[in-house]
């Protein structure tokens, strides 16, 4: 094992006291301290002091006060600041990637590619919307009584203060999705990171201040549990909540936000499916399975967990998959050769182990993996499970780990019906060399995004969000405009 050397910037940052970033300043929390654990070792790497309710309120007031100035800034100037932030994240790419890898267990390669390179790309995309958020002029049909005329137009106006609740699996990239969309529309934002990954957004907020984003436009409030998030959501200054996370927590967020009439965007994951058609070889199927289900230890909201394979090829595919996964031995996320790191926190580690044991108890077949690795850290073997039926827990409950469930089908129509029987619908994929058939199935699958011969690829130009129990609203593309602006109509008589 050969780990990269941590940059001095990273070690110096870790030694600092950590709390909040409010009104352009770092400040210690007034709540309880909590440890930040490196999931590769199980050891604390830093301590963060949580905000108390007064600090949460002050962050919201800071964002509200900054809103009036920020919304009046010329739109191209807002876009220019987002471009500067993108350039700064690119300059600090390695330091931020190392910090994220330490906190989340993400391999350093993925941290560089996804957390940083994708964040930079999304910032630049959203910056390009500056000056392009437009309304319409409208012809109206009101009668003229004395020669008067009428016209009307619409305009998009920023909502106000956005509360962005960010999960632990992609703490920089998902925060940037929310931050960039809010800021380019003229909103300000208060970000609440997960207590498992609270550090990187503090550094991003510092860099945002350094490039000239005014104080109060971006605030970061830390805290364990849901109390601080609830305080932010219910604050009178909150105009919108953007949440990414679990279904159970998302339902609570929706209830709290809706009770006071606030806009809400929810991206909740679920139980995503992948369908492999019979024309593919077992080798092609296995390559697709690894891409769809095991990237980042399966800790991706859109990752596939249910795999539908032709019954006649099921055993051959699973035998080949078992051989391929043997090369994915988990290792240190700071080793550039590592393909699979630890799970991001102890709670998730315990949950995944519990679900694997449930599969055993229910009579499912563990094809490979299924065990924790000895030693320190939250490492699990990549696991493939051949389930008995659709009633297996692993076909219904989100695992969010390196565990994929496989079941055979005898007709493609049967497989489609079983895929759509889920209460969730964030993402799915169809794999086939028959593009005509794959495109037809993409129309029938009940999911917010359907990939063909690919999985878990996101592009800022393509809207992303869930159907059914997997969420409300869309991110990216032009769809984000509806969620961060108010559509105002103006009618004129002249």
Predicted segments with their positions:
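Short, well-ordered beta-strand elements within core beta-sheets of diverse protein domains
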Residues: 44-51, 66-72, 163-164, 274-277, ...
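ALDH superfamily catalytic-core signature
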Residues: 248-389, 452
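Glycine-rich loop-to-alpha-helix module at the N-terminal edge of alpha/beta enzyme cores
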Residues: 45-134
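Structural signal for hydrophobic packing residues in well-ordered secondary-structure cores
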Residues: 67, 71, 86-93, 97, ...
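Hydrophobic face of amphipathic alpha-helices that form TPR/SEL1-like repeat modules
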Residues: 1-40, 125
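Residue-level signal for inorganic ion chemistry
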Residues: 42, 78, 100, 186, ...
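Rossmann-like NAD(P) dinucleotide-binding subdomain of oxidoreductase/dehydrogenase enzymes
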Residues: 134-284, 409
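Conserved C-terminal structural/oligomerization subdomain of aldehyde/semialdehyde dehydrogenase
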Residues: 43-46, 238, 275, 356, ...
């Amino acid at each position: 094992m050969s780990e990269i050397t941590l940059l001095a910037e990273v070690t110096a940052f870790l030694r600092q006291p950590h709390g909040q970033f409010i009104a352009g300043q770092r400040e210690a929390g007034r709540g309880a301290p909590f440890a930040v654990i490196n999931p590769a070792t199980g050891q604390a790497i830093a301590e963060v002091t949580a905000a108390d309710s007064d600090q949460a309120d002050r962050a919201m007031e800071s964002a509200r006060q900054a809103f009036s100035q920020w919304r009046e800034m010329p739109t191209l100037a807002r876009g220019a600041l987002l471009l500067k932030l993108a350039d700064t994240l690119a300059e600090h790419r390695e330091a931020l990637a190392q910090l994220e890898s330490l906190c989340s267990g993400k391999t350093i390669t993925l941290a560089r590619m996804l957390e940083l390179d994708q964040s930079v790309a999304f910032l630049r995309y959203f910056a390009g919307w500056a000056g392009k958020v437009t309304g319409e002029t409208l012809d109206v049909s009101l009668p003229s009584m004395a020669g008067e005329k009428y016209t009307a137009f619409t305009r998009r106006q920023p909502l106000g203060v956005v509360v962005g609740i960010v999960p632990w699996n992609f703490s920089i990239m998902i925060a940037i999705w929310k931050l960039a969309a809010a800021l380019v529309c003229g909103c300000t934002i208060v970000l609440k990171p997960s207590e498992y990954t609270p550090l990187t957004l503090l550094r991003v907020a510092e860099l945002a201040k350094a490039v000239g984003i005014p104080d109060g436009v971006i605030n970061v409030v830390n805290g364990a549990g849901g109390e601080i998030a609830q305080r932010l959501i219910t604050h009178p200054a909150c105009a919108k909540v953007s949440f990414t996370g679990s279904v159970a927590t998302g339902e609570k967020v929706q209830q709290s936000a809706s009770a006071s009439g606030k806009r809400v965007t929810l991206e909740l994951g679920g139980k995503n499916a992948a369908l492999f058609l019979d024309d593919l070889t077992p080798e092609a199927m296995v390559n697709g399975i690894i891409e769809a289900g095991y990237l980042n230890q399966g800790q991706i909201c859109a990752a596939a967990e249910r795999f539908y394979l032709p019954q006649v090829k099921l055993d051959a595919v699973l035998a080949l998959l078992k051989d391929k996964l043997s090369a994915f031995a988990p290792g240190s996320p700071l080793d550039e050769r590592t393909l699979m790191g630890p799970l991001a926190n102890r709670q998730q580690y315990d949950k995944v182990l519990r679900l694997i044991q449930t599969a055993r108890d229910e009579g499912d077949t563990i094809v490979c993996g299924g065990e924790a690795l000895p030693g320190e850290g939250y490492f699990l073997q990549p696991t493939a499970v051949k389930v008995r039926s659709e009633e297996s827990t692993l076909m219904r409950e989100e695992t969010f780990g390196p565990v994929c469930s496989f079941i055979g089908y005898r007709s493609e129509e049967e497989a489609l019906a079983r895929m759509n029987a889920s209460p969730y619908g964030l993402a799915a994929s169809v794999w086939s060399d028959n593009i005509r058939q794959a495109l037809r199935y993409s129309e029938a699958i009940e999911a917010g995004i359907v990939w063909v011969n690919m999985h878990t690829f996101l592009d800022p130009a393509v809207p992303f969000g869930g159907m059914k129990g997997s969420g409300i609203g869309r991110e990216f593309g032009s769809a984000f405009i509806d969620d961060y602006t108010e559509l105002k109509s103006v009618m004129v008589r002249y």
